[in-house]
From Swiss-Prot:
Its cofactor is Fe(2+); L-ascorbate. PANTHER family: PKHD-TYPE HYDROXYLASE YBIX. It comes from Escherichia coli O139:H28 (strain E24377A / ETEC). InterPro entries: Oxoglu/Fe-dep_dioxygenase_dom, PKHD_C, PKHD_hydroxylase, Pro_4_hyd_alph, Pro_4_hyd_alph_FE2OG_OXY. This is PKHD-type hydroxylase YbiX. Keywords: Dioxygenase, Iron, Metal-binding, Oxidoreductase, Vitamin C. GO terms for molecular function: 2-oxoglutarate-dependent dioxygenase activity; iron ion binding; L-ascorbic acid binding.
Length: 225
């Protein structure tokens, strides 16, 4: 399943990020890619050795960790270190699949269950640059407002179309979920959404408490921590 997570960053935060990223050191994006991806990748990334990068990636981690909808959809166990990329002048990233595991500075290795892109450019400011994701439900083309995030299974083939006008800047990361299976995670997300909707409509009652108990028992049964 694919999820649109709105408002991860406020417009003020986005503007500040963009201003700081104008001063960043950018390097060839292929430095973080395996052999298959390097053949189809043509973009730039912020140098991960810079002081600015360390500050910005911490802000992204804090923002997603505090977003209730992100947590409900991803049920994250481990988040990768966020990266930042830039596309301009017809730069693109052809269809590829993300690696199943990635190194992690604290945990050694992590499994990539979900991929996330946090958009940092106004969609009207550039042409092209759509994230295209192929999954079991078909093909999805994504170009979200700045500050919004898209979450999708890392097992999906995906690409970024050429940016023919302007500049597309984004942050991206991977998530190891407490729930490995996409279908089970989607069921928990739907159940959680319905519980929250019923609580807002009717307040606390025995039926809602029973559903909440069911949610946590399923989470207890399926989670890997």
């Amino acid at each position: 399943m694919m999820y649109h997570i709105p408002g991860v960053l406020s417009p003020q935060d986005v503007a500040r990020f963009r201003e700081q990223l104008e001063q960043a050191e950018w390097v060839d994006g292929r430095v973080t890619t395996g052999a298959q991806g390097a053949q189809v990748k043509n973009n730039q990334q912020v140098d991960t050795r810079s002081t600015l990068y360390a500050a910005l990636q911490n802000e992204v981690l804090n923002a997603v960790n505090q977003h209730a909808l992100f947590f409900a959809a991803a049920l994250p166990r481990t988040l990768s270190t966020p990266l930042f990329n830039r596309y301009q002048n017809n730069e693109t990233y052809g269809f590829h699949v993300d690696g199943a595991v990635r190194s992690h500075p604290q945990n050694g290795w992590m499994r990539t269950d979900l991929s996330a892109t946090l958009f940092l450019s106004d969609p009207q400011s550039y042409d092209g640059g759509e994230l295209v994701v192929n999954d079991t439900f078909g093909q999805h083309r994504v170009k979200l407002p700045a500050g919004d995030l898209v979450l999708y299974p890392s097992s999906s083939l995906h690409c970024v179309t050429p940016v023919t006008r302007g500049v597309r800047v984004a942050s991206f990361m991977w998530i190891q979920s407490m729930i490995r299976d996409d279908k089970k995670r989607a069921m928990l997300f739907e159940l959680d959404n319905n519980i929250q909707s019923l609580k807002s409509r009717y307040g606390e009652n025995e039926e809602i408490l029973s559903l909440l108990n069911l949610y946590h028992n399923l989470l207890r049964e399926w989670s890997e921590i």
